[in-house]
Amino acid sequence: MCPSEMGTLWYLWSPVLISLAALFSKVTEGRGILESIQRFSLLPTYLPVTYHINNADVSFFLKEANQDIMRNSSLQSRVESFLIYKSRRLPVLNASYGPFSLEQVVPQDLMLPSNPFGFTNTFSLNWRLKAYILQEKVYLSHPKVQVLFHIVGRDWDDHRDENLPCLRVFAFRETREVRGSCRLGGALGLCVAQLEMLPGWFSPPSVVSGRRRPTEQPEGNPVELYYAVQPGDERGDCAKEDSRKSGGTPAGHNDVDESSPPLHRIGSVFLRETPSSPPLKELRLDSNVAVHYVPKTVRQGDVLTFPISVSRNCTEDRFTLRAKVKKGVSIVGVRASSSSIWDVRQSTEYTGKYAPAVIVCQKKSAGSEKSVADASYEVMKIDIEVEAPSDPPTTQLVTWQVEYPGEITSDLGVSKIYVSQKDLIEVIPLAMEAEILNTAILTGKTVAVPVKVISVEEDGTVQGLLDSVECRSSDEDVVKVSDRCDYVFVNGKEMKGKVNVVVSFTYQHLSSPLEMTVWVPRLPLQIEVSDMELNQIKGWRVPIVSNKRPARDSEEEDDDEKKGRGCTLQYQHAMVRVLTQFVAEAPDPGGHLAYLLGSDWQVDITELITDFMQVEEPRIAKLQGGQILTGQELGMTTIQILSPLSDAILAEKTITVLDEKVTITDLGVQLVTGLSLSLQLSPGSNRAIFATAMAQELLQRPKQEAAISCWVQFSDGSVTPLDIYDEKDFSLMATSLDEKVVSILQDPKFKWPIIAAENEGQGALVKVEMLISESCQKSKRKSVLAVGTASIKVKFGQNDANPNSSESGHLGAGLHVENINDRRSKKPFQEWGSPEGPFYSSSSMGLMEGWGSTTKRPTFQKKEGQENLLDDIILSQTMATDLTSFPDQMDLPGSNVGTEEHDLDQAAKGLSDLEIGMYALLGVFCLAILVFLINCVTFALKYRHKQVPFEEQEGLSHSHDWVGLSNRTELLGNHMNFASSQEEQITAIDRGLDFEESKLLLSSNSQNSINGQMFRSTGAMLTDDQEQKSEPPTSPTSKRKRVTFSTFSAISSDDGCPSGNTMVLSNEDDIKWVCQGLDPGECTEPHSCMERLHEHV
């Protein structure tokens, strides 16, 4: 590789390296800004609107991961997401700020995107339709299928006349269908639909010629069941349907069309021609004898048969079985089943209708039972008849016991006979809610869900069961059940949650499970503090209250600051909220954890645990209302959340109160003339709802008034709404910069000044000063903590472009604020994204739209050499910002308040870790470039004796014709291109010169030896004329170029040393030369020459 190739590579790669370095430094700088924002403050900037949810039983505000700064980046709006978990009527969202208040009913379609009860007039939040198949096996002798439907989530105590829908049930078998219907009703909101299966469906599947014979299923012929929800007729009855008792209808005909409601699958039933023998329940008396019976409900006059079996391995030759019954049943007969093996005789020792039966069994011959193949065999059958019960219905007991010779007896065995005049086929437990939110862990208050157990008879009659119901929870660490089986509950002592946890309910011989989902808060809870390091605020003195210890005087304070007796420096405030996720374990072991909303969503539970929050050391910090943290004294402490039921700590967060003082660097001011509120469904969850409150700035009529919203930024980077500070600790003084446009009202009835419109105009017309409290003011001068300006627009009669959505009269009159939805055209939901891409917006105004010329951003003071964090947030997150709303900071009154003092504080802090890293990275890049240049020089010396081709030498023949144009202050700003500045263009004569010549002209820090020769300057450089003609600023020749003529001659250097100096382009007035102190004969060694050259570099 020759030196010319090396120069070409450097020429090509140096812009790439420089660009990469610049790009990397920009990325690092941008990431550093965001990291510093998160380091100092967890709160994004927003309009401090207060939201309240009314008419909801259980609701929560939410936080989505990494979305707060994206959605809340302006003082003009606030976006809050919330969840309506449980409500019996339409909730109402209230947004208020100062004197402005706005309410909006949350539409049902936002809470229920897919509502099967949407056509009803009833609010059906949390309603779910659940179906129970009463018999999964259907026989030809009784070809009926019954399905019970029940509304879960409906309030049983609300007995309003609701127009509940009808349900149509479909049974499909091959290509035919059968239908049935029922209408929901009653306090429990249930009904039973009945379908009669066709006789042909019980036969084995038909064989079609040319096809394989379908395999017979042992369970029977499967039939699929579906249902559809449809409204009733004018009288509330279900629409008349065709009878399907003969032959059915081919599926897809008649009622099944595109306009029909969607079908929902229920399950499958199996059809059999003949019923199989019912399974027997075994009651084992000991290892030898067992009693068997069929668990079922019987009526008066029915006879039950109890088979008695003996184990094949029984070694006893004789035993006596005693059966004792009470009034209502009697033993009517004993029959021997294995007369060849056992001799069975009933004793006549006891007589009477209800006398116990004594049956003596004697084995005839030893070893005769060996012919039995099974493990046990039947010895006899005992028939028991059911008589008229005394108190119908009742349960009769039969007591069994076995005696052996030698007075050896077994334990007593009891079998139950359930006597009833009704033919019960199923019992079903119904819960009013499908899930339980276990907030008892947080509050200590029991959360219970009512349960009712109903029975269903063969004819479809439903009746509630009050007594004789038994229940048991499968896991009491998840959910518990009451002794009377009338509700399931959680009391805060549970350890976990679970999906579909089972609670079993039993009535007589019938048993049915109740499945529920229990959500528990994930521990430990997360305490979110907007600023975990609280400092004293320099210059902000507040009165000392009785329970507040005065801060010790600082050595930096002057005598004037110590004069204010009874006052101390204010500490920073921080906002506190507690977040958690409600989770539940999967029903199967090893399954994934289930979340109430999703893994990216957290629930704000601050209001639930406010009474159990405390600061471990109250002398260091104080927690006001569980939401505002105030520093008290230097030290470190923790915020703790205690369990209401034990001594456990559910969460804790360390906070520090520092001795270092901070100053207020910026005061952001937003004028509010009204509020608008819009709602939209969250794109991240179908249950979360976004509420966007916007501040209106336009004043539309004379004397219309506006309120003030303020945020403060401190020198440590934290930002905080001014509303969280006590209004007694400071005061705001507003000044109109144009009395003709707006005026200021200092009404003592309101804590902050009021701005009133006078005439049309716009701009930064209001200056707001933040002062310390009157009792802590100095004797002669007002102590101004911060100054901010507010932009405002007054346009009378403007109702079309961007009107306020609220009519504002006097602020104390109780204003009615309309929703901006009424005046804006609705736009379709779009996807969140960049300004170029789609984004979700509400029906009125989204987060990134609607900010035209009438919407001004808050203006902050910028200190010299300091970036404003609030501006960084706004500019980086909202691309549609109107830049004209930022007035020049140099023109703002009071913009230099505390500048010098703040600069000293910033200088004392030194470099941050990010800055150190950036400088280290820059040093590495510079070192890499320096090594690259040294390698280039070494490469040039190594190949200095090589010759260039003849064609290349021809390109050097006109080196004396070079002419360079330069500026008076800068010859060439970029040594890679002649024209590098947008404002000034430096022209090069003869652009078509050979590239090797141009390369030699622009080489800055290296010498290129070609053919053993160096270029030497033989002419003097000419400068500009000292006097230039004055020209107007707009003249294209107002900036003259300096013409420099340089003549080069190729002088051979036999000793290898450069005989001339290579021209180096710089920003000096004259062109400098490398090794200008060296004469051609001074250097005899190339290495020493290169060392001298390296020193210059």
Swiss-Prot record:
Membrane topology, record value: Single-pass type I membrane protein
Record keyword Cell division present: no
Compositionally skewed regions (Basic and acidic residues) per UniProt: 233-245
Topology feature Extracellular, residues: 31-913
Residue stretches spanning the membrane: 914-934
Signal peptide positions on this chain: 1-30
Keyword terms: Membrane, Signal, Transmembrane, Transmembrane helix
InterPro entries on file: Ig_TMEM132_2nd, Ig_TMEM132_5th, Ig_TMEM132_6th, TMEM132, TMEM132_3rd, TMEM132_C, TMEM132_M, TMEM132_N
Name listed for the protein in its UniProt record: Transmembrane protein 132D
The organism of origin for this protein: Mus musculus
Species lineage: Eukaryota, Metazoa, Chordata, Craniata, Vertebrata
